[in-house]
Amino acid sequence: MAAGKRDYYEVLGVSRSATAQDIKRAFRKLAMQYHPDRHKGEGETVQKQNEEKFKEVNEAYEVLSDTEKRGMYDRFGHEGLNASGFHETGFNPFDIFNSVFGEGFSFDMDGGSPFDFIFSRGKKSRQNRVVLPYDLEIAVGVDISFFEMTNGCTRTIEYTKRVTCSACDGFGAEGGETGMVSCNSCEGNGFILKNQRSIFGTVQSQMLCQSCGGQGKQAKHKCKTCKGSKYKKVPTTKEIQIPAGIYHGDALVDDHGGNEFGGHVGKLVVHVGVLPSKIFKRVDHNVVANVLVDPMIAITGGKIELPTLEGIKEFNLRAGTKSGEQIVIPGGGIKFTKNFRKKAGDLIIIISYARPSEYSAPELRKLKEFIKPNQEVKQYLNALKNEYKS
């Protein structure tokens, strides 16, 4: 192996059996990671390290992406490439980068949108590149009640999405592609040269032309249908299934429900809000409710009415039920769908004593006949007295 040269497969992080697609995918990731424009202002040492990495990655890709060069490298290694004169001829890493990403590519987003995305129409040429005029993803919100959350529900949502203008095929020009002329701003190049000062002196970089979006062309006359916007708005109705047990703030995603442009389709993201209940509270997959009962019924036992997710139901409260005591009804909680869990949660009822009813004097005298010392109160008073003695 040539002195100082790393194995090209190791450089790209792929195996020797990697396909051309695997190699290109690895190159795109590493080239973006080490591109000098991404490390401006990080210090001379860091910039130098990334420049060397960038050159190394591009060199490895130039060899492994070429069937003939890769075959020679696999058989004879770096020495074989040296014999063929590859290492002596030199190369420009930016030429390789631009051949993959396009000549108009730039990390400079001045005046651009964070949603700008370049794709090709047919051949990968500068004239065919198109910048998406809008984000493809659509986000909407929908609120459901606590009861709907516990059992799951169906919601119909209405929203407006954008689709490619069929009159101009997304070019924004009258007559479509035939109505496009050379861009005045970039003179048909698709990019604008920009001089920037750096520690190495004045560096010239390419910036995507914002006037034509990197196409090198612009509309001679705007499309009469879309007024040059390249799209039309379409009112859309969609029915969505909201599973039981969904949490407040969770999102449901339809991979093909978003905006469309030039054959690309975005996602529809539905953010679900769960309205709070005045009765119930969620604790994981269980449902908790505080229930007021008459102290006399709690003492003597009897029928009370309990709130459940299916409605109000009668329940026989045993005699001597204490305030704060819990009644657990298995399976009475959230009924998760198969997408979450198969077992339903529990309904937990917490008993609280209501204010005692008002009784007449004769009734109170009669009730006093049944009063006997309360052992819990007696223990509390003894502890209180001991506290004062200490």
Swiss-Prot record:
Residue ranges of every copy of the J domain listed in the record: 5-79
Transmembrane in keyword set: no
GO biological process annotation, one example: chaperone cofactor-dependent protein refolding
Residues binding Zn(2+) 2: C183, C186, C209, C212
First and last residues of every CXXCXGXG motif repeat: 165-172, 183-190, 209-216, 223-230
Start-end of CR-type zinc fingers: 152-235
Pfam families linked: DnaJ, DnaJ_C, DnaJ_CXXCXGXG
Record-level Gene Ontology MF annotations: ATP binding; heat shock protein binding; unfolded protein binding; zinc ion binding
Location in the cell: Cytoplasm
Alphabetical keyword list: Chaperone, Cytoplasm, DNA replication, Metal-binding, Repeat, Stress response, Zinc, Zinc-finger
Keyword Secreted: no
Gene3D superfamilies hit by this protein: DnaJ domain (1.10.287.110), Heat shock protein DnaJ, cysteine-rich domain (2.10.230.10), Urease metallochaperone UreE, N-terminal domain (2.60.260.20)
Free-text comment on the cofactor: Binds 2 Zn(2+) ions per monomer.
Cofactor(s) listed in the protein's UniProt record: Zn(2+)
Positions contributing to Zn(2+) 1 binding: C165, C168, C223, C226
Any one Gene Ontology cellular component term annotated for this protein: cytoplasm
Assembly with partners or alone: Homodimer.
Function summary: Participates actively in the response to hyperosmotic and heat shock by preventing the aggregation of stress-denatured proteins and by disaggregating proteins, also in an autonomous, DnaK-independent fashion. Unfolded proteins bind initially to DnaJ; upon interaction with the DnaJ-bound protein, DnaK hydrolyzes its bound ATP, resulting in the formation of a stable complex. GrpE releases ADP from DnaK; ATP binding to DnaK triggers the release of the substrate protein, thus completing the reaction cycle.
Domains as described in the record: The J domain is necessary and sufficient to stimulate DnaK ATPase activity. Zinc center 1 plays an important role in the autonomous, DnaK-independent chaperone activity of DnaJ. Zinc center 2 is essential for interaction with DnaK and for DnaJ activity.
Annotated protein name in UniProt: Chaperone protein DnaJ
Organism for this UniProt entry: Mycoplasma pneumoniae (strain ATCC 29342 / M129 / Subtype 1)
